[in-house]
Each structure stands twice: as structure tokens, then as C-alpha cells.
Amino acid sequence: MFPFSGRGLGCLRLCLLRVWAGEATGRWACGTCQSRLYGSGGSQPEVSRSDPARGTLKEWALLSQKLHVQTIGGKVICLGTIYGNIDIHASDKSTVTVDKLQGSSVNISTEDGLLKVKYLYTESSFLSSAAGDITLGSVHGNITLRSKMGNITVDSSSGCLNALAQQGAIDVYVSQLGKVELKVHKGSILVKVASSLQAYLQLSGKEIDVNSDVHVEEMNEAHRDDGVIITGFLNQTSEHEKWIKADAPKGTIRFRSQSWFQSLKLQD
């Protein structure tokens, strides 16, 4: 059992937590997998071991300097909030599903399983998957996404976003802008932006579809043998410090305007 101290905020405070989870039929090296705090005023949290038959890691709320989780063939599920520097690696068909992550550094990877985070507040994040989809809700900060054979979806991005997919689709809504760079080698890109967003725009793809409700100033369209390049400025800005660049050499880029309310997904 790892040392811990109870807090009245529904969190388990740890300086360093390492968890390894084997397959559902495999051996578990360490089983500190579920944490909940009952009562208030410094009452002790109850830490229970995961059920090896299910192969699932569940975290309710953690406040830590560093959290390291590694699983092979199981599931990592966070039902609440994780605070701190986070490092999660899920091998085989393992999935990672998290309600909220908040910290200075977040590193999450999966191989053939879904990577899903509802809220992400971080200074720097790197999320990757070999063959699973990456599905994010509201993200803030400097976010880097990598996928080899999966789709990337971001419901709302506020800050700097760099997303690269080898084969798949990218679907992103940009609410507030820093620098956004999207690229897919084999697939298409859908970019939705807030109607008032100001940015330099550069789109490059086999086909490009810019909706008429998007106001692009000084738009320049250049055709080439293998596609089209469109550049311009959104909403009468001439700054190059904030920009959106999208590249789909073998696919279609669709650019749309979308309200903040439309970006909300009113479902679980």
C-alpha cells in the first residue's frame, strides 16, 4: 500500500504513484487502482485494489506531483479529476477514458485503444495513439496530438494545437487561438472556428471547401497539379502571430464557422 494523507476535498494526495495493470487474465504487479475519500475534515481515503478479472483501473480524484500509470490489455478510467504531472501508457487494446486532467505536463499514449479526455487544462500535453481514436472535449494550453491509423477529434481548442494523423480524419473546433497546425497524410480535415476569430489562414489540400459564412480577407487561391492552396486573413486581421494551417495532400479540407453553443455536446 502506498503512503497517503487524507484531505477534505475528495482527493488522494500522493507524491508519486506508479500503477501497472496486466491483462484481465494476467498477473497484476501493483493494485492501488481506485481512490475515494469519504467524509470531510481530513478523513482517510479508502484505497481498494482493482478487480483482476475485469482488468480495469479506476481513479476517482488524485492530487499528485507525478502520476504514472501503465496497463497492458486493461482499461484506465478516471471518474473525476487528476491534478499534477501525468504519464499514462496503455498497451495492446487498452483504453484510456478521463473526465478531467489538470497539470503542467501530460503524456498519454495508447496502441489500439480509444484515448478520450473530456477536459484538459495543461501547460504542455502530448497525446498519441498508434491505431486508436483520440477524442478530446475542451482543451486548453499547448497540445500536441499524434495518430498513425486513427481519427482525431477536438470539440473545443483554446491555445496552441498541433495535430498530425498518418491515416484518418481530423475534426477540430477552434474557440480561442494561439497557433493551430493540422496535417493528415491520408484523410480529410474539418476545421470549425468561432465566428469572431481572427487569424492568418493557410489551407493546402487536394480539395478545399471554405463555407460562405467564413469571412476571409485578401484570399489568394493557387492551383497546382496535385491540389489547391488558399491563404488569407480571418475577420480583417493582418497579424501572422496567430494562425491556422491545415494540410491534407490526399484529402479534402472543409472550413466552417461555428458558434460556441453549437460546439457544445449536450450528452454524456
Give residue spans per PLM region.
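Intrinsically disordered, low-complexity terminal regions
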Residues: 1-268
